[in-house]
Amino acid sequence: MAALTIFPAIDLKAGQVVRLAEGDMDRATVYGDDPAAQARRFADAGATHLHVVDLDGAFAGASVNGAAVESIIAAFPGQVQVGGGIRDRAGVDRWLALGVARVIIGTAALKDPEFVKSAARDLPGRIVVGVDARDGMVATEGWADVSDVRVEDLARRFEDAGVAALLFTDVGRDGLLKGCNVAATVALAGVVDIPVIASGGVAGIEDIHALRPHVADGIEGVITGRALYDGRLDLAEAIAAGAA
């Protein structure tokens, strides 16, 4: 069985490394002001993949922390995926030109699905669709808005579009260390033939152990942020557990 990929997260707000509680910009905890140094620390612990979010961009609808992301890409030898504020093809192309491996598109996946499908067809393996859920419904605009579209229905729209993965985030758990919503993540993987990345609520090594058997069900990896920053999860241990 393939390994469960561990994606340490770097969320950027005004150039700083932060974590939000439930996607609320007013509930941000600052963990550092040198994103590149944080990326190097993750690499030193064995990380081969990195998940970066331009939080200001997610709310503004355009890239805001470009310089910080560039510094991360320069510092991290593995693959970097970036999301936040990517609403058009120019935004996708700009990140890819900087060396980003995969671009995550969330809000635009709901509001402009044809753009996402076109990008996925033109750029195989480079587009990840962010499926952000609050009580089973799709949340957009930095999670500030909740739509009337069910998560499964949004995912199915991209079944044959060639997207690299679906990034499923349970917004109600994100940054709260409540534990990953394994059941909902596995359920989503069960309705589409697209790899799914779990996100939101990872509290410790038990979440890695819970997700690991479901690689066979289509779970590609898991994103973890606050558990790492708060010392509740050791990255090297998580990577080893994901590969065990």
UniProtKB/Swiss-Prot annotation:
Any transmembrane segments, and where?
A: none
Q: Where does the protein end up?
A: Cytoplasm
Q: Which Gene3D superfamilies match?
A: Aldolase class I (3.20.20.70)
Glycosyltransferase keyword on record: no
> Which pathway?
Amino-acid biosynthesis; L-histidine biosynthesis; L-histidine from 5-phospho-alpha-D-ribose 1-diphosphate: step 4/9
User: What EC number(s) would the UniProt record show?
Assistant: 5.3.1.16
Enzyme class, first EC level, given as a word? isomerase
One of the protein's GO biological processes: L-histidine biosynthetic process
Q: Which reaction does it catalyse?
A: 1-(5-phospho-beta-D-ribosyl)-5-[(5-phospho-beta-D-ribosylamino)methylideneamino]imidazole-4-carboxamide = 5-[(5-phospho-1-deoxy-D-ribulos-1-ylimino)methylamino]-1-(5-phospho-beta-D-ribosyl)imidazole-4-carboxamide
**GO MF annotation list:** 1-(5-phosphoribosyl)-5-[(5-phosphoribosylamino)methylideneamino]imidazole-4-carboxamide isomerase activity
List the active-site residues. 11 (proton acceptor), 132 (proton donor)
Q: Which keywords does this chain's UniProt record carry? A: Amino-acid biosynthesis, Cytoplasm, Histidine biosynthesis, Isomerase
Which GO CC annotations does the UniProt entry carry? cytoplasm
State a single Pfam family of this protein: His_biosynth
Stated family? Belongs to the HisA/HisF family.
In Swiss-Prot or TrEMBL terms, this protein is called: 1-(5-phosphoribosyl)-5-[(5-phosphoribosylamino)methylideneamino] imidazole-4-carboxamide isomerase
